[in-house]
């Protein structure tokens, strides 16, 4: 820790993207304190079964915000999940970057808000918690916009597509596809961006603009 800046890892994406299943384990392996709001909401509601799911979600969100604020103030490594669908968390991340804290975002997306809704519905059928459809549709737009706004401040951005469906016979889930990796303003992968799906094109376009601007800067 003494030899490098503190790091904040953000596993981001609209509800139903499959964030935890893709990279939750990898984030835990970073050694940073890791906060999963879904797990926190479950613990909160288990402790008080009279609490509604919405109230538990809200309490978990506020808990995560406080932990992020503490990590920034104390310059600690921290990892957490977020939809990045509103304004508070992106503003805190921008503040962290201005304080020379490395902010690394791994963003997981699906091809459409309707697929996010279907994945959440499948999760509910297995006992998971629900998210209102209007919230999912709104976050599908705003989360990507927030990533684009944050991009010039990020140490690293990875974008994954998790739209592939499980095999109906085996149940095997296809591996998520890495669509984009940007490090310190430069695109480092993949070499060919021509197959970028429509939902991720705004992110790739923003990364290409940043890459061009970064390369024009004097060394």
Where are these regions (language model features)?
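NTP-dependent small-molecule kinase module
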Residues: 150-219
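Conserved substrate/cofactor phosphate-moiety recognition/catalytic segment
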Residues: 21-76
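Glycine-rich phosphate-binding loop used to anchor ATP phosphates in small-molecule kinases
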Residues: 56-108, 143, 150
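Conserved glycine(s) of the Walker
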Residues: 18
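Short hydrophobic/aromatic beta-strand immediately N-terminal to the Walker A/P-loop
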Residues: 9-10
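Phosphate-binding P-loop
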Residues: 1-6, 71-72
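P-loop (Walker A) phosphate-binding loop of NTP-binding proteins
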Residues: 14
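A glycine- and Lys/Arg-enriched "phosphate-lid" helix/loop adjacent to the NTP-binding pocket
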Residues: 99-147
């Amino acid at each position: 820790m003494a030899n490098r800046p503190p790091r904040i890892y953000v596993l981001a994406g609209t509800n139903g993207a499959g964030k935890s299943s893709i990279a939750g384990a990898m984030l835990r392996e970073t050694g940073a304190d890791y906060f999963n709001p879904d797990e926190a909401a479950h613990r909160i509601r288990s402790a008080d079964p009279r609490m509604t799911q919405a109230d538990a979600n809200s309490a978990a969100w506020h808990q995560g915000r406080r932990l992020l604020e503490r990590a920034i103030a104390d310059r600690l490594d921290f990892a957490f999940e977020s939809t990045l669908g509103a304004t508070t968390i992106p503003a805190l991340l921008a503040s962290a970057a201005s304080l020379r804290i490395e902010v690394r975002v791994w963003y997981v997306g699906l091809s459409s808000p309707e697929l996010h809704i279907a994945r959440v519905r499948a999760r509910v059928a297995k006992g998971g918690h629900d998210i209102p459809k209007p919230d999912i549709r709104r976050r599908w737009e705003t989360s990507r916009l927030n990533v684009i706004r944050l991009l010039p401040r990020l140490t690293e951005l990875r974008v994954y597509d998790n739209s592939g469906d499980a095999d109906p016979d085996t149940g095997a889930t296809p591996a998520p596809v890495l669509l984009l990796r940007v490090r310190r303003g430069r695109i480092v992968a993949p070499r060919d961006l021509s197959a970028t799906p429509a939902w991720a094109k705004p992110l790739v376009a923003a990364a290409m603009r940043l890459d061009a601007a970064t390369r024009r800067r004097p060394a």
